[in-house]
Amino acid sequence: MYVSSLKFPFLGIGVWKGVRLWRQRSLGTSACALKQDDFIKELDQNFVRLQKKLMDSLPSSDWSPFTPTGDLPPERADVVIVGGGVMGWSIAYWLKQKENRRGALKVVVVERDPTYSRASTVLSAGGIRQQFSRPENIQMSLFSAQFLRNINEHLGVVNEDRIDIQFNPSGYLFLASEEGATIMEENYNVQRECGAQVTLMLPDQLKKKFPWINTNGVALASYGLENEGWFDPWTLLNAFRRKALSMGVYQCHGEVTDFSTAKREMITADGDPVTFSRIGHVTVQMPNSLESQSVECSLVINAAGAWSSKVAELAGIGTGPSNSLEGIKLPVEPKKRYVYVVHCPNGPGLDCPLLIDNSGAYFRREGLGGNYIAGKSPAEEEEPDISNMEVDHDFFQEKVWPLLAHRVPAFESLKVKTSWAGYYDYNTYDQNGVVGMHPLVNNLFFATGFSGHGLQHSPAVGRAVAELIVDGGFKTLNLSSFSFRRFWSQEPLLERNIV
């Protein structure tokens, strides 16, 4: 069992206070000061050797917060975070924020793509909203909005430039048909109960507020009045990363390829065997190299986003009998989504919100030069190939543009300027995040599967995971319903408002 220096502070503090006090009293009263001095020096040396021996036995022994971090992982760590996207760096920041003294926790973030060329975070449209159907998602968004508004208080670094998150508080606008109006009203009631500033509008009110909208087929609209809009995803990722590094977090560029685990088999009350395991070492493969490094650790956090299911399999999750808890996989898959930047000089102006059409198409303003970001999630039978980052331009021409032009007639004359593809860490079970410890691998935690809203919830989820680890439970927002156990108990936590 790993013995933490946090639990035994007397090893580094109490012993030394006693020695110093005894030494001061001895030197002040004894007539044999020289002999006592020699004895004290020898005793000091023995204590130094003892302290070094104790510290060498801990995973944090070879690290100093003042030592510059490099790309190679250390031999030991307290916490290894798999995934250096915004979720991983948020968790790292909050862990260091909660440590009781600098250097108490040695945290390592492992990211296989240091350029972030395939990262979900920086390829996102950058939206934040409170218009969800689950109270937990609404509460996380409310916290994240306040966090972003005060980001320099949280993530500012001395002698570094202030953070400009480029937050555009223009709101989200959801449109519903007759079939979806009842659900929209139900969601609205939940949102208001949670404190979200949202209003409902009938078609004539909608047309008065936004004259450029064609209201045909719209029965009801839901509009966010505060704390909704969009921001720059890369700035948030880099701000979390910069702050965490300044607090002593170690970053490593490489890919986690294996876990070494200790296993123990037990028999349940029903007489069924069950295997519990604990990760002892993480194997990190260096980029463009055959070299790998084994990292001894106490905890592992799976924040690998779209690829987190593969990381879970390395720990044996989902590899047992299909009718057992050991056989339940982490139901998170990569889903490729296209984002198109279009230009339309006569399109909606400064009042343009992030509009979610009842057809599933969406768009928002990008700057003030007549540019917009647009897209749509494909139907299940049209899911694109995830093996590459190529963009399907026919999908825009056939599936997106007609819907945009129907809702905003000015978009009939738009032109595509550029486009890109990104990945959702899509939870196929209920489209909600997975947060907390695995029930059988008792030092593996999850923070993944948010199905497109992980970026906006990263400040809240990072804080929640840090609370679980440092405090032993959720202290601010109760996210226990997001646990892995719901897959075994067959209790889906459905989110209706997935874009």
UniProtKB/Swiss-Prot annotation:
Molecular function GO terms recorded: oxidoreductase activity
Biological process annotations from GO: mitochondrial respiratory chain complex I assembly
Keywords noted in UniProt: Electron transport, FAD, Flavoprotein, Membrane, Mitochondrion, Mitochondrion inner membrane, Oxidoreductase, Respiratory chain, Transmembrane, Transmembrane helix, Transport
A GO cellular-component term linked to this record: cytoplasm
E.C. no: 1.-.-.-
Transmembrane segments: 75-95
Cofactor: FAD
Major enzyme class: oxidoreductase
Membrane topology summary: Single-pass membrane protein
Cystine crosslinks: none
Main location: mitochondrion
InterPro entries membership: FAD-dep_OxRdtase, FAD/NAD-bd_sf
Cellular location(s): Mitochondrion inner membrane
Pfam family, one: DAO
Function: Required for the assembly of the mitochondrial membrane respiratory chain NADH dehydrogenase (Complex I). Involved in mid-late stages of complex I assembly.
PANTHER family according to UniProt: FAD-DEPENDENT OXIDOREDUCTASE DOMAIN-CONTAINING PROTEIN 1 (PTHR13847:SF287), SARCOSINE DEHYDROGENASE-RELATED (PTHR13847)
Name of this protein: FAD-dependent oxidoreductase domain-containing protein 1
Gene that encodes it: foxred1
